[in-house]
Amino acid sequence: MKKLIALPVVAGLGLALLPAGPAAARPTAPAVPAMPAGVTAGSIAWKPCPDTDPVLGGLLKGLECGTLAVPLDYSRPHGKKIRLALTRARHTAPDNRYQGVVLLNRGGPGGYGRDLPTRFATGSNGLPTSVGSTYDWIGFDPRGVAGSEPKLACDPSYLYPGKARPDYVPRTAAQERVWLRKAQRYAADCGRRYGDVLKHINTKNVARDMDAIRRALGQPKINYFGYSYGTYLGSVYASMFPKRVRRMVLDSVVRPSGVWYEANLDQNAAFEKRADIFFAWVARWDSVYHLGRTARAVEANYYKGMAKVRKAPIDGKIGPAEYNDVFVPNAYRNYTWPDHAKVLADWVLRGDASGLRAQFGEPDWLAQNSYAIYTAVGCRDAAWPRNWKRWHADHSRQHRQGNTFLTWNNAWYNAPCAFWPVPGGTPQKIGGGKHGPNILLVQPENDAATPVGGAFEVHRLFPSSRLVLERGGNNHGASLSPNRNACLNGIVAGYLGTGVRPASRKGADAFCKATPAPDPTAPAATSAPVDPVLLPGLR
């Protein structure tokens, strides 16, 4: 039985001090067509990318760079324009084997994308060059992100004020009010800076931007590969532009009916399960880490380490919130486990904080930009509860139920949406008919960020899709990634190469065994480097 931290029943949070902002009313403006009349095809002037990009450094070397002007507001196609930053890795196969363009999205929302073509074109992610060479790979920074203009970044103190933040888990009403005021300030600052832009930052407009890219490239259809949030973007595009999809891979699939408040509640139980799997793995290797022979014993040591930094933050910078952040990636992927287990053992057993210092990084401008777009898109895509009592009740209940690892971290990560200066919109209706878009879904069974139910929901909504399930799979972003699952990679490569997909059957259409968990005693058994294609998005 887990030892749970009791949370107060908040009857007197003092919410009168915290006005909720605009009511979550449905927008009254007329619906905008998928691609309104009057939106003309723009043009892209490609040129070699600089060896050192002002935003992404050396990540774009060897690619072609370009920009595309698109409407800020698609209901006013001749109005204000914004600029999308793009990259391209051109096909190297003979023209008679050319298969068109593939647009790429790593997730988020808020993930940059201009670096992605290199790994797909060169095969460094496991895609055979015999397939990768037949496509033009297109990376793009979505509206507001990284190299696109305007680029958003709001109150930097919300993510990190230069010192340890308050504990994520509020033990008193006063502690909860501190986080609420921080969230309110963040939302207000975004409104002050970008009030005329925020209403146009949403997934439907990013899908329209993708179709504008297609038109500018002169392509009748696109291919697409999206991870995590990129699966929701792909689902939206396929629903808005079903005749424009040639092939589409969606890996680690978002549940569309949950966007976005319910989706985040879904995550809390899923992250708890994944944390338990990590703790059980550490216990299995007690001969290496000495943190306990059971998952519960390891978990107790994890919270013991958190109590130490709560009492005395490391360097005044790493408190319980930052400590939790350091270990959250273990719920996204297995290949961080050896390093993070050592970090935990060093801190709890020996008081050595060097590993925590190395793993903790103060958010840079890209992280601030990514978070600004995460909130801008999520808060605008759909309605969120504007009464904090609902948030408090839901997250307190989940915490009491034993979901202690991420629940309040997740609450505060999304809390600005309770105060966002523009109301949430109406989500795109997702789905296609029996003869709809040609989609391949890839889903790890134990994915925490996008729980497995989302893949089955999208599979039902697109009867023409095929679903490959990685049984026991734990790594968010399972194919063409550091997960290195040859079965999944083979199915995806076959699909991109020739269009072949598994035959349709009830439930999942094909299965792959999970990639084995790491063995810390194997030669050179250190954690694989974190590939930025799989940075935690979709929190």
Q: Language-model features: where?
A:
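Catalytic-loop region of hydrolases
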Residues: 2-7, 21-168, 173-175, 207, ...
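Catalytic histidine-centered segment of alpha/beta-hydrolase-like enzymes
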Residues: 474-486
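Alpha/beta-hydrolase fold active-site neighborhood
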Residues: 295-436, 481-482, 490, 507, ...
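Catalytic histidine neighborhood in serine/cysteine hydrolases
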Residues: 86, 462-477
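Conserved alpha/beta-hydrolase "acid-adjacent" motif
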Residues: 448-453
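Alpha/beta-hydrolase fold nucleophile elbow
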Residues: 219-229
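Short beta-strand/loop motif that positions the catalytic acidic residue
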Residues: 435, 440-443
